């Protein structure tokens, strides 16, 4: 279902207008603050958005590097170019990633990804795609679109090559999403079908206009939309209620090539904090969680980690363990002496 960009009343139009230029965004925000209006409302239910620059990235990519002041780190074959960050070039056996150094503690958020996938390969002779991550671990290379398998968190995959030979009902490129608590492996042979939350076809390769992906997480409701037709409108792709994601994870994006390849470029990543009104009942229901999960979807080993013991608790455990050990030894000695005394009486 398309969300047409009409007047500035719709939240989609507002976001697109603000995303055009960071300078105009800041100027507009300052004018709004100066007039006492604050950030613009972007939807029903009193929802407002704020750009979080510590979790965002755009040209000229000054926050990318290895220094202590850098907000983003590159990994593998990823390179900073003038107009984009190239995760992988159109060459075989390459992988690269871009990771935010700052953990995200936002409760409700929206990530807008401006990307481009292109290359020389003809139909079905290109790959493999890219992924957008919100995970507990960062900078961990692996086989899942350049990231580690059995990750903890959320992965959104733009898969450009079908590995499953017998699949016919699915047209690639294909966008899918997966929530993992560290117990599941991504099934490459079946293109991730056993663990996906949903997906949609997305013809995003070798296009001559901008392509965008939006990941929205509000009130434990995950929504993924795309703007890939050059019409400046969002199309729904995935919508999943009951998604529980812990706070304090990292945003990143990665890509990998094998025998087939493509250029996988990221132009910008922009994260918005969404302020959403909650009822008292929703406040109770939406408490922080320790492990990612999805309601009505059973994941193996869904056991929350025990909180670490405090110093006092550890001392008391050791102390009482020693007392119990000494007590057991004393009782053992007393019983042994009584047994020996009874044995001597029988002997005489």
UniProtKB/Swiss-Prot annotation:
Q: What membrane topology was assigned to this protein in its record?
A: Single-pass type I membrane protein
- What name is this protein filed under? VIP36-like protein
Leader peptide range in chain numbering: 1-44
Localization, UniProt: Endoplasmic reticulum membrane; Golgi apparatus membrane
**InterPro entries associated with the record:** ConA-like_dom_sf, Intracellular_Lectin-GPT, Lectin_leg
Extract one GO BP annotation from the record: protein transport
- Described purpose of this protein according to its UniProt entry: May be involved in the regulation of export from the endoplasmic reticulum of a subset of glycoproteins. May function as a regulator of ERGIC-53.
Please name every pair of cysteines joined by a disulfide bond in this record: 200-237
**Which species is this record about?**
Homo sapiens
Q: Give the record's glycosylation annotations as residue positions.
A: 181
**Gene3D superfamilies recorded:** 2.60.120.200
